[in-house]
Amino acid sequence: MARNFRDKTVVVTGASLGVGAAAAREFAKTGANLVLVARGLEGLEKIAQELSAQTEVMISALDVTDYVACQRMLDSAHDRFGRIDVLVNNAGYHKRGPIENLDPEEIPRMVEVNLSAPLFLARLILPYLERAGGGAIVNVASLAGMAPVPGAATYSATKFGLRAFSFALAEELADKNITVSLVSPGPIDTGFIMDNIDEVTDITFSQPMSTAQQVGAAIVAAAANESTEIAMPKSSGILATIAYLSPSLARRLRPKLQAKGARIKAQYRSRNRS
């Protein structure tokens, strides 16, 4: 039986735009109380204003790598709503390019936001979930955590780590009525890819893009149905699974996928200029 989120409390990080905002909208439809977290106050205020007619919304502008601030946020959320039931670890950071071209400071930043912060937030929220009698943690990873992408080596590594953490944590918490789910999307049409088309690797364009709304709906479904992992879109998830199981086969397929992606990327670039 699927979970009912009415009057439950859901914490969403990276909630001011894109997938996080989409997940907030989808959870609002279920009647859940929302705790929306992001660095930018203006974006949080905008999404809160949009959703406040549907449900109770609390916002908290903070950096997810500031664990003292995260603890205060959770305490405040519990004080306001009396319970916390779901954590969506969605906040992420991605700096594209070969590792030799990356500013060395970008590497620990990606690790801290994409991997360390979800681990710490999961740890911080556990007492609240146990107090509520159980709950759900949904970690937003990427198909790059199954099939690493050249030009995104550090990002891929963080998502591989988040995937491993999710599966292990699910086993640790199985007897506590706390589920841990993973949502692993491919490229997402949030505008960033098209606005930075020259920085995006050709192979990215070889796969169909999901919308933020589709990923947001998958996050709610994962929490409701206690899914282990939702890889999306399905066709790309199958391809990523093959690449994960057979890296040598993935290397043989990569030139064809890069060529396909280059053609589609050129079409997008031409369309943007017209």
Would you name each region that the model predicts?
Residues 98-99, 103-111:
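Substrate-binding pocket helix/loop in short-chain dehydrogenase/reductase
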Residues 142:
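Residue(s) in the substrate-gating loop at a strand-loop-helix junction
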Residues 61-73, 104:
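The beta1-alpha1 cofactor-binding region of Rossmann-like NAD(H)/NADP(H)-dependent oxidoreductases
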Residues 9, 16-17:
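Conserved glycine-rich cofactor-binding loop
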Residues 122, 158:
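Active-site helix of classical SDR
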Residues 172-236:
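SDR active-site lid
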Residues 30-47:
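Conserved glycine-rich Rossmann-like NAD(P)H-binding loop of the short-chain dehydrogenase/reductase
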